[in-house]
Amino acid sequence: MEEDSLYLGGEWQFNHFSKLTSSRLDAAFAEIQRTSLPEKSPLSCETRVDLCDDLVPEARQLAPREKLPLSSRRPAAVGAGLQNMGNTCYVNASLQCLTYTPPLANYMLSREHSQTCHRHKGCMLCTMQAHITRALHNPGHVIQPSQALAAGFHRGKQEDAHEFLMFTVDAMKKACLPGHKQVDHPSKDTTLIHQIFGGYWRSQIKCLHCHGISDTFDPYLDIALDIQAAQSVQQALEQLVKPEELNGENAYHCGVCLQRAPASKTLTLHTSAKVLILVLKRFSDVTGNKIAKNVQYPECLDMQPYMSQQNTGPLVYVLYAVLVHAGWSCHNGHYFSYVKAQEGQWYKMDDAEVTAASITSVLSQQAYVLFYIQKSEWERHSESVSRGREPRALGAEDTDRRATQGELKRDHPCLQAPELDEHLVERATQESTLDRWKFLQEQNKTKPEFNVRKVEGTLPPDVLVIHQSKYKCGMKNHHPEQQSSLLNLSSSTPTHQESMNTGTLASLRGRARRSKGKNKHSKRALLVCQ
């Protein structure tokens, strides 16, 4: 089983990387094993937290925190729509959510990475930088996403949007690492991507016989929520951190008293991410059925109740993007998203169509993936725009905000135009393919039962159309010159998705995501008595 795979199956909360290791942890573990611990350990809960926190800075800093721009570089207004080249709505919806992620967009527009990148081809960070720059600086236009964004993933049919989202995030994480050398996992957790999307879980098992405590800390990039018995995101989070009793056949083998004993297991967030990606588990691996129930999600979410430390103030996140799947099962459907522009206005991004939306409409969707950002981060970016401190996105005083693809390409060889690049596609495909990526995932999870969802075919009455799709009638009939798919579709007659027009629902087809289960890898534990 490869360590670099994004999903290794098993318990979902430990699905990204292997456990933290260091000489300090090994030494502490060995010392605990050698000594007989009293019933109450002198180490407090705060001491254990500090010990774990100290492990991460020891890793080599591949993308120091000061590299993240401190002020916003994004234009205040909404950017471009994305052309659907046939069964690519899942790509477009995911890219729009990433494009309007403030820390990521600001880093891309600062050009920190491309100025030092030596890979030139096959670099996902450089490819995303080119895409985000074009999208944000071409409001009112429709652009074609680069083929390199989905090389090795798209196979001519609709795929799962969340899988593509995390495939892209994982590719950007790997692009932060130097070359193709093997890097330890603590160092991987210091990359730019982990700084933005990453945090740490704490899984704590307390022996009820000797009161010994085992803490395991694991990194995460997204959080999957079981919604079968939940009516809201808050309820799903409460179920996630609810203590689990281990007794009977599931009794815990304690490393302190060296016997099987009843225990209590609790999962909490040890550190919080700047940006939270919450995935609502709506699909079944076995049947492909979808839970079409409404799950409430707030505009502002307090994550403090789910943290390891409860003695601090509120930890408020604000919603800035929602990825939606419209359809009845993973075998058919259409993806679109809602994003919040820097100016604070919400927009519906449905392929080429960009329409203004109200917060009421945003919060009434059957969401698939929710994107939250810490309130302090959002306010900092918003204040810099309101004060007129927006820096030039391309780093030159007289560069036009609507930079052309040719200008970007001349600035740096990594920034490729959206036209096809056979060498880039070939290399990207060789490095990571969908089949290889999915081979690393275990398929032994069960999912919720199927419920039919009614799909509305009209836009809300309060929606203002900013610009309509130039391809609303479909490329097949009116744009024969664009029959060749941007994302390397099959030469056989493909199925083209059409952008949703006002009062018309796009074609529903394709397949959707698989749920993520819980990862039950072996754990390196730090045993402490209390």
Curated annotation (Swiss-Prot):
Occurrences of domain USP (ranges): 80-375
Superkingdom, natural source: Eukaryota
UniProt GO MF annotations: cysteine-type deubiquitinase activity
Cross-referenced CDD domains: Peptidase_C19E
Keywords: Endoplasmic reticulum, Hydrolase, Nucleus, Protease, Thiol protease, Ubl conjugation pathway
Active site annotation, chain numbering: C89 (nucleophile), H334 (proton acceptor)
Predominant localisation class: nucleus
A Pfam family: UCH
Gene Ontology terms: cellular component: cytosol; endoplasmic reticulum; nucleus
Enzyme class label: hydrolase
InterPro entries according to UniProt: Papain-like_cys_pep_sf, Peptidase_C19, Peptidase_C19_UCH, USP_CS, USP_dom
Statement: the UniProt record of this protein carries the keyword Endoplasmic reticulum: yes
Family: Belongs to the peptidase C19 family. USP17 subfamily.
Name of the molecule in the record: Ubiquitin carboxyl-terminal hydrolase 17-like protein 13
Organism: Homo sapiens
Classification of source organism: Eukaryota, Metazoa, Chordata, Craniata, Vertebrata
